[in-house]
Amino acid sequence: MSGRAQRQHPGRLTKRAEFLAVQRGLKLRGRLFLLELLARGDDDPPRVGITVTKKVGNAVERNRIRRRLREAVRVHAADDMATGTDYVIVGRREILDAPFGALKDELSRRIRGNKPARTG
């Protein structure tokens, strides 16, 4: 084992009601994606949902956008996520043309800069 801290793996948002609940939270619009976040008020690991609307391309393009976002969260942004917080990332078509380094840096920067205040 290395001396690094244990990496926290975010859970997944899977139900429509969970995605809709996060819509009531903070929205951060950007060129590559829309980031919505909502503090749950517990100490459970963060949860992430990734979606791309049908306005964006065809199924192949939407799936590629989802895969790029999922990988950016896995390799870079997961460490920046606050416990007890739900995140929804709505991908945009511009992700297809953006360099992966720029995508993961932008995602990490937005998540790091907007950790919700802890309640209680």
UniProtKB/Swiss-Prot annotation:
Q: Any keyword Zinc?
A: no
User: SUPFAM superfamilies from the xrefs?
Assistant: Ribosomal protein S5 domain 2-like
* Keyword tRNA processing listed: yes
What Gene3D superfamilies does the annotation carry? 3.30.230.10
> GO BP, one example?
tRNA 5'-leader removal
Q: Which reaction does it catalyse?
A: Endonucleolytic cleavage of RNA, removing 5'-extranucleotides from tRNA precursor
| GO CC annotations, alphabetized | ribonuclease P complex
Specify the superkingdom.
Bacteria
Which GO molecular function entries does the Swiss-Prot or TrEMBL record give? 3'-tRNA processing endoribonuclease activity; ribonuclease P activity; tRNA binding
UniProtKB keywords: Endonuclease, Hydrolase, Nuclease, RNA-binding, tRNA processing
* The protein's Enzyme Commission number: 3.1.26.5
Q: What does this protein do?
A: RNaseP catalyzes the removal of the 5'-leader sequence from pre-tRNA to produce the mature 5'-terminus. It can also cleave other RNA substrates such as 4.5S RNA. The protein component plays an auxiliary but essential role in vivo by binding to the 5'-leader sequence and broadening the substrate specificity of the ribozyme.
Q: How does this chain assemble? A: Consists of a catalytic RNA component (M1 or rnpB) and a protein subunit.
Under NCBIfam families, the record lists: rnpA
User: According to its UniProt record, which protein family does this protein belong to?
Assistant: Belongs to the RnpA family.
Name of the featured protein? Ribonuclease P protein component
Organism per entry: Chelativorans sp. (strain BNC1)
